[in-house]
Amino acid sequence: MKNITDSFVSVGYWSSAGSFGFNTDILATNPINLSVVLGVLIFFGKGVLSDLLDNRKQRILSTIRNSEELRGGAIEQLEKARARLRKVEMEADEFRVNGYSEIERERVNLINATYENLERLEIYKNETIHFEQQRAINQVRQRVFQQALQGALGTLNSCLNSELHLRTISANIGMFGAMKEITD
C-alpha cells in the first residue's frame, strides 16, 4: 500500500515541481527525447503510412487500368463509328450518283415524252387542218355544184320547151335502162 501512496505523493510532487509538460522551445528540447518520439512515430506510422500509400497506389493503378480499358473501348467504338461513317458516306455517294442518274433519266424520259406529245399534237393539228381543208373544199364544191345545177336548170328551163324536155327525159331513161342491163 505504501507503493500506491508513494506513487500519489510522487505524482503530486512532480506536478508541483513543474518538470512534466511539453517544451515548445525546439533548441531547449532534448535530442534524445525527439529521436525517441520520431522513432516511435516511424515504427508505428510506417505500417499505417505504407498501407495508406499502398491503397492509394492500388487505387491509382486501378484507375489507370480502368482508364486504359475505357480508352481501348472508346478507340474501338471510334473505329466502328468511322467505319459506319465511311459506309454511310459511300451509300450517300451511291444514292447521290444514282439519284442524279435517275433524275437525268427522268429528265430525258420527260423530254422524250414531251417531244412525242408535240409530234402527236402536230400530227393531230395537220390532220385537223387537212380535214378542215377537205370540208371547205367539199363545201365549195357543193356550192359550185348547186350553183352550176341551178344555173343549168335555169338555162334548161328557159331554153327547153315541152317537146325537147320530153325527149331529154326519154333519152336519160333509155341511158339508165341500158346501164341497168349492163350491170345485171
Curated annotation (Swiss-Prot):
<comment type="function">
    <text>Component of the F(0) channel, it forms part of the peripheral stalk, linking F(1) to F(0).</text>
</comment>
<dbReference type="GO" id="GO:0045259">
    <property type="term" value="C:proton-transporting ATP synthase complex"/>
</dbReference>
<keyword id="KW-0066">ATP synthesis</keyword>
<dbReference type="GO" id="GO:0009535">
    <property type="term" value="C:chloroplast thylakoid membrane"/>
</dbReference>
<keyword id="KW-0793">Thylakoid</keyword>
<keyword id="KW-0934">Plastid</keyword>
<feature type="transmembrane region" description="Helical">
    <location>
        <begin position="27"/>
        <end position="49"/>
    </location>
</feature>
<keyword id="KW-0472">Membrane</keyword>
<comment type="subunit">
    <text>F-type ATPases have 2 components, F(1) - the catalytic core - and F(0) - the membrane proton channel. F(1) has five subunits: alpha(3), beta(3), gamma(1), delta(1), epsilon(1). F(0) has four main subunits: a(1), b(1), b'(1) and c(10-14). The alpha and beta chains form an alternating ring which encloses part of the gamma chain. F(1) is attached to F(0) by a central stalk formed by the gamma and epsilon chains, while a peripheral stalk is formed by the delta, b and b' chains.</text>
</comment>
<keyword id="KW-0812">Transmembrane</keyword>
<keyword id="KW-0813">Transport</keyword>
<keyword id="KW-1133">Transmembrane helix</keyword>
<comment type="function">
    <text>F(1)F(0) ATP synthase produces ATP from ADP in the presence of a proton or sodium gradient. F-type ATPases consist of two structural domains, F(1) containing the extramembraneous catalytic core and F(0) containing the membrane proton channel, linked together by a central stalk and a peripheral stalk. During catalysis, ATP synthesis in the catalytic domain of F(1) is coupled via a rotary mechanism of the central stalk subunits to proton translocation.</text>
</comment>
<keyword id="KW-0138">CF(0)</keyword>
<dbReference type="GO" id="GO:0046933">
    <property type="term" value="F:proton-transporting ATP synthase activity, rotational mechanism"/>
</dbReference>
<comment type="similarity">
    <text>Belongs to the ATPase B chain family.</text>
</comment>
<keyword id="KW-0375">Hydrogen ion transport</keyword>
<dbReference type="Pfam" id="PF00430">
    <property type="entry name" value="ATP-synt_B"/>
</dbReference>
<dbReference type="InterPro" id="IPR002146">
    <property type="entry name" value="ATP_synth_b/b'su_bac/chlpt"/>
</dbReference>
<keyword id="KW-0406">Ion transport</keyword>
<protein>
    <recommendedName>
        <fullName>ATP synthase subunit b, chloroplastic</fullName>
    </recommendedName>
</protein>
<keyword id="KW-0150">Chloroplast</keyword>
